[in-house]
UniProtKB/Swiss-Prot annotation:
<comment type="similarity">
    <text>Belongs to the intermediate filament family.</text>
</comment>
<dbReference type="GO" id="GO:0045179">
    <property type="term" value="C:apical cortex"/>
</dbReference>
<dbReference type="InterPro" id="IPR036415">
    <property type="entry name" value="Lamin_tail_dom_sf"/>
</dbReference>
<dbReference type="Pfam" id="PF00038">
    <property type="entry name" value="Filament"/>
</dbReference>
<dbReference type="GO" id="GO:0005200">
    <property type="term" value="F:structural constituent of cytoskeleton"/>
</dbReference>
<dbReference type="GO" id="GO:0005652">
    <property type="term" value="C:nuclear lamina"/>
</dbReference>
<feature type="domain" description="IF rod">
    <location>
        <begin position="39"/>
        <end position="388"/>
    </location>
</feature>
<dbReference type="InterPro" id="IPR016451">
    <property type="entry name" value="Intermed_filament_ifa/ifb"/>
</dbReference>
<dbReference type="GO" id="GO:0005882">
    <property type="term" value="C:intermediate filament"/>
</dbReference>
<feature type="compositionally biased region" description="Polar residues">
    <location>
        <begin position="1"/>
        <end position="10"/>
    </location>
</feature>
<dbReference type="InterPro" id="IPR039008">
    <property type="entry name" value="IF_rod_dom"/>
</dbReference>
<dbReference type="InterPro" id="IPR001322">
    <property type="entry name" value="Lamin_tail_dom"/>
</dbReference>
<dbReference type="GO" id="GO:0005737">
    <property type="term" value="C:cytoplasm"/>
</dbReference>
<dbReference type="GO" id="GO:0006998">
    <property type="term" value="P:nuclear envelope organization"/>
</dbReference>
<protein>
    <recommendedName>
        <fullName>Intermediate filament protein ifb-2</fullName>
    </recommendedName>
</protein>
<dbReference type="GO" id="GO:0090435">
    <property type="term" value="P:protein localization to nuclear envelope"/>
</dbReference>
<comment type="function">
    <text>Cytoplasmic intermediate filaments provide mechanical strength to cells. Not essential protein. Component of the terminal web (organelle-depleted, intermediate filament-rich layer of cytoplasm that underlies the apical microvilli of polarized epithelial cells) in embryonic through to adult gut cells. Correct localization of filaments requires let-413.</text>
</comment>
Amino acid sequence: MSAVSYSMHRTTTTTSSSSHGGVSAGHAAEEFVASAEREKQEMQQLNSRLEVYISRVRQLEDRNKELVIELDTLRGSLGNDIGQIKFKFNDSLVKVRREISEAHSGTIGVEVKVDRLRDDLNDYRHRYEEARREVEREKTTWGGAISQAQAELDTNKSRYAAILDEEKRLYAEQDQLYLQLAAAKDELDAAIVDRRRLQAEEDDLKIELEFLGRIHSQEITELRTLLAQAPADTREFFKNELALAIREIKAEYDKIIQTTRVDLETIFQSKISAVESSIVSKNEAAVFRQEEIRKMNESITTLRAKLSELEARNSALEREANTLQIQLGEDQRAYESELHKRDNALRFMREDCQTLIAELQALLNTKQTLDTEIAIYRKLVESEEGRFTHVGQGVVVAQQETTRLVPVEQDHWDSGEVQTRSSFKRHAKGNVSIVECDPQGKYIILENTSGSVAEDVSNFEIRRVIDGVQAFVFRLPSHLVIQQHGHLKIYGRNSGGINSPPDSIVMESHPSWGQGGQVETFLYNSHGIEKASHIQTTVASSR
């Protein structure tokens, strides 16, 4: 039996996080780093245990070689003393069985450790999702605050524009009031001019009245003189007539004077009243307008103070918004960096788990091979209690290759020859094919042979037929895509696989894919059309 060499590679990634966001995301990142450190220590311990296990397997291999050499020597030198040989190697077989049992116990411990690591990985994934949701919530909160600040800024800008429009309107109204005040002053000047003109007319009428009085007095004097020069009877006649005429003239003169005076006083009083009422109304309007202007000036001063305050607040809000934008960008970059680091860490952990599972599978295969050899040795020793006839040596171990039968070794003894052969054939219609089916029913591998197109295998069906009887049908989950030159490994529930789409998934409905002499595997698309098949035949013969 040839020696088997094993190598383990462990990649440890230490992540560090820097958060400018909330406290929850930073705390989650610190927990993730601490968990990664704990996982590294656990993986180192697991690595040490696997090294011890591998060294024990190598010791078993060396011991097996020694037993094979001793068995060959005994076969060449002894004939009928097979009972002594059995007695001689009974202790060795018991010891080997015990060591194999201990190795199997170690393997179970490794499987338990792998399950625990899988649970830890799911826990880390859950923590990562919680941290991501926390970051999203904080991003939404900051976005709402920025939107509110932006809305308040827009409101302040609109209020500022309204204040500017109000200021322009007040300035225009002030100019209109100044124009009305100038017009009122012009009307006042015109009223003063009219008053002075009427006073001048009154003075002229008074002078004219005085002049007419002097003329009438002179005429009366002349008439009296004439009356004195006339005879008595004539004088008496004219005296009465003259007195009557004088009374009539005086009455008419007084009437004219009174009428003129009343008219002049009425006109003058009406003019004066109109001018005074106009002046009073204009003064009241001017006072009201001055009061309005004063109030407007005070309002403008207040609005300017508020505007300065709003501008300062606007500047502060803009600075805060810029700071929030910068902080949000830094948080986004830190989040993306942390997400990238965690993706890398998860990918490395997944690769390490895949490596450990592959090595564990190799160890299990080696253990199975050792069990087969020990069973053959036991059967050989028990069957050779009588006469031992050496025919040949070899162990047949059938391993699956791509398209050919693989006989490894053969054992011959007097009871006959046992030989196991496996072969398979496959075909595919399209880019997706069944590239491998584990003979022990642990997994099935699908492959996308295209180098440019990703294949969607959502809701595809895998039908398994074992020894002519359909075992079961498994439907692939939705949203499952195989990338270019990618593989999809589908494990049974108890086959030690991990659920990590799109690289590998676990069939939870059955513990394994089953095994038998004639195993047929078919792949159907979602419309029930056959896309690929894999037929594996295992033949065991003895003679």
